[in-house]
């Protein structure tokens, strides 16, 4: 009887933990299934997919959020899918990469990424101030556009003592602009004459969030996805030094100090460990394909959650100056990124 009770406790704990998340997870799963079916329908009708399942998941999720009031009970599961499932997917993605790819990045590219982040921060902030935005709001927009979107905004807010309304305004448009960028990105390779590697670099440098990079690069295949992910994660690693610097500048060293695990998220560590495991043959070949499939499924679900988290109507509250500042920042980032590609190509 005691043994039965002992076995029941973990099961009951799992149910208590999963129950609040289940409605939102199921909605994300339904949107993901619709996206996968829509992609297959395109292939059957036209011979190929104009829009991949990753982009479709964002589109369907955004459309659903804009047309229907989602139940409050689903919010926890949607947030879980957008954050935790994404983090797991990114960590697992490391199993599809090896150290040889990382070596190919080279010191010039890594240095270029750091320089672009720094220049983008300075010029984006300057553009925001020229448009009349308050200093802290301009800082949030600069951090969001230059590093990793909403995550950078959320991390920078306590470091600079930002007001909640400034955080909400910057996040509102950054989320929508990120989705727009993902939808337009796949047209750039042909327009700019970029190959898969160059496009991966461009997407990794300009797109806000990791799932959006995956969605933007997927149409060009595995090389673009792998390159874009590596560049994006190197960019994310700049978050720690930037937040530490902002804390000192704004005198928030006590309130805004972040722990190491906040500056270097666990999934980046997991991503690197999976690369190491793959490189040293610690992952059996038979597991590589299932792990890649699981990572892809979780990524689709996280992007469905991303779409379900974007309310286009919130743009009304963001304000015209915020929209212009964020758009100018993104254009500037694109110009700098294209310049880095030309520089690495010449080298």
From Swiss-Prot:
InterPro entries in the record: UPF0324_pro
GO terms under cellular component: plasma membrane
Pfam families according to UniProt: Cons_hypoth698
Transmembrane domains' residue ranges: 15-37, 50-72, 105-127, 140-162, 172-194, 201-223, 233-250, 263-282, 287-309, 322-344
Main localization category: membrane
Subcellular location: Cell membrane
Membrane topology, from the record: Multi-pass membrane protein
UniProt keyword list: Cell membrane, Membrane, Transmembrane, Transmembrane helix
Annotated family: Belongs to the UPF0324 family.
Protein name per UniProt: UPF0324 membrane protein Atu0671
Organism for this UniProt entry: Agrobacterium fabrum (strain C58 / ATCC 33970) (Agrobacterium tumefaciens (strain C58))
């Amino acid at each position: 009887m005691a043994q039965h009770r002992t076995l029941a406790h973990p099961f009951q704990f799992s149910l208590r933990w999963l129950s609040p998340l289940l409605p939102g997870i199921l909605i994300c799963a339904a949107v993901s299934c619709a996206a996968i079916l829509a992609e297959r329908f395109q292939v059957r009708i036209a011979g190929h997919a104009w829009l991949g399942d990753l982009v479709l998941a964002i589109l369907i999720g955004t459309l659903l959020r804009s047309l229907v009031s989602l139940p409050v009970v689903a919010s926890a599961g949607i947030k879980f899918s957008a954050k935790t499932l994404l983090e797991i997917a990114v960590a697992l993605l490391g199993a599809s990469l090896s150290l040889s790819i990382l070596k190919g990045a080279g010191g010039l590219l890594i240095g270029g990424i750091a320089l672009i982040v720094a220049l983008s921060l300075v010029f984006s902030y300057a553009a925001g101030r020229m448009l009349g935005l308050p200093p802290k709001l301009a800082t949030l927009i600069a951090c969001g556009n230059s590093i990793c979107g909403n995550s950078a905004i959320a991390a920078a807010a306590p470091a600079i003592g930002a007001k909640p309304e400034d955080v909400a305004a910057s996040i509102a448009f950054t989320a929508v602009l990120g989705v727009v960028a993902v939808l337009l990105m796949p047209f750039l390779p042909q327009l700019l004459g970029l190959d898969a590697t160059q496009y991966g670099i461009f997407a990794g440098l300009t797109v806000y969030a990791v799932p959006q990079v995956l969605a933007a690069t997927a149409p060009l295949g595995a090389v673009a996805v792998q390159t874009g992910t590596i560049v994006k994660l190197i960019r994310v690693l700049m978050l720690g030094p930037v937040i530490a610097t902002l804390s000192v500048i704004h005198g928030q060293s006590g309130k805004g100090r972040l722990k190491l695990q906040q500056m270097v998220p666990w999934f980046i560590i997991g991503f690197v460990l999976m690369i190491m495991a793959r490189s040293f043959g610690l992952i059996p070949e038979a597991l590589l394909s299932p792990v890649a499939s699981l990572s892809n499924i979780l990524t689709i679900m996280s992007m469905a959650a991303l779409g379900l988290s974007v309310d286009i109507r919130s743009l009304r509250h963001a304000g015209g100056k915020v929209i212009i500042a964020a758009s100018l920042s993104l254009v500037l980032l694109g110009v700098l990124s294209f310049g880095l590609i030309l520089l690495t190509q010449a080298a």
